[in-house]
């Protein structure tokens, strides 16, 4: 079905067409009384409506999703359940928090003792590459205080058939995958292979993207931490720019396809004069003219650049290919931006100027998460454990209107959530100077 995106919810282009199915698969009938989840109330397949959206000027519902919480009946017997956890892709604040949350909820609430981490991403599901680590409350007790992932990560696709067979051969019942869109596509492929074989193994995706660009979820863990730490970088280049004659400070922040971090950090900090994001392509001539006017009037300028900005201005014959996860490699536009600004300023007689550049990306993504993100991670892990024990599969745990919900993986992993440039977040940027 052809669909279009409204913020982070997918709806058909045709306003009269049926909505995409959001029904969650189950590996079998739940017959075991859930005596483990008390005192949380059972959700038992309760649903909530997604935000109403406008399509061709007509407001319509955008479907219902299942609440992710404890069920009165569960599918798996905790005494015999064996769980695998894998982390894939780039680092993100909160990975260890989610791992810890999964282990504590499985072990202390459902009394599941057989919990294992598969090291180095999806390589952990390939027999000749696999490194398996038992996880207990003692092992994960203080990992939330550290950045990174105790399981390690890797990029690159592996065979769904091989990974499904690994789970079967090693008697795993549940697989939790922590990762971004590429990881979720892999989880979807594993789940489809298991369903094809009619094997009752549950696959639950936990969305991990520091860029906050996964559909159907309002926010992802690590995002708030990234916004907070990004402000420190903006503060630094602001000080550098103000302390130099005709000073120009440039900060590059994460945001391969979406500019949420750049926008949130700039709005929160208040010192950015120009924000460049992938969703808006501002011609380099307008950028340079703005910088020139700002230098002449204020004596300095601060520019925040999302890493995916200015991609439409790269040389047409430049093809960088893709990374191991299949993501298109982006052109490094910073040198182009610096050279263009320098050339323009010299052309209008501003020979003396200084450009200072900061890229805090690796420092941010490898940092421990903030208190708000730590709380979010624990709640996310709690919801994931409940739906997994109930035999729900092929889903991602999303956060919508302060509720954790289950969304089919294929609805979240093949589309990218981007900044709505007609929405309130971007229009608030009108309070900040920008090119006309």
From Swiss-Prot:
The record marks 182 as: Important for substrate specificity. Keywords: Allosteric enzyme, ATP-binding, Cytoplasm, Glycolysis, Kinase, Magnesium, Metal-binding, Nucleotide-binding, Transferase. Optimum pH is 6-7. The keyword Phosphoprotein does not apply. Pathway: Carbohydrate degradation; glycolysis; D-glyceraldehyde 3-phosphate and glycerone phosphate from D-glucose: step 3/4. InterPro entries: ATP_PFK (IPR022953), PFKA (IPR050929), Phosphofructokinase_dom (IPR000023), PKF_sf (IPR035966), PyroP-dep_PFK_TP0108 (IPR012004). It catalyses: beta-D-fructose 6-phosphate + ATP = beta-D-fructose 1,6-bisphosphate + ADP + H(+). One of its GO terms (biological process) is fructose 6-phosphate metabolic process. ATP binds at residues 90, 155-156, 180-183. SUPFAM superfamilies: Phosphofructokinase. The active site is at 211 (proton acceptor). The keyword Phosphoprotein does not apply. Mg(2+) binds at residue 181. Activated by nucleoside triphosphates. Inhibited by phosphoenolpyruvate. EDTA and biphosphonates play the role of inhibitors of kinase activity. Substrate binds at residues 209-211, 254-256, 307, 362-365. Its main location: cytoplasm. Its cofactor is Mg(2+). GO terms for cellular component: cytoplasm. Catalyzes the phosphorylation of D-fructose 6-phosphate to fructose 1,6-bisphosphate by ATP, the first committing step of glycolysis. Homodimer. Aggregates to a homotetramer after activation by ATP. Belongs to the phosphofructokinase type A (PFKA) family. PPi-dependent PFK group II subfamily. Atypical ATP-dependent clade 'X' sub-subfamily. This is ATP-dependent 6-phosphofructokinase.
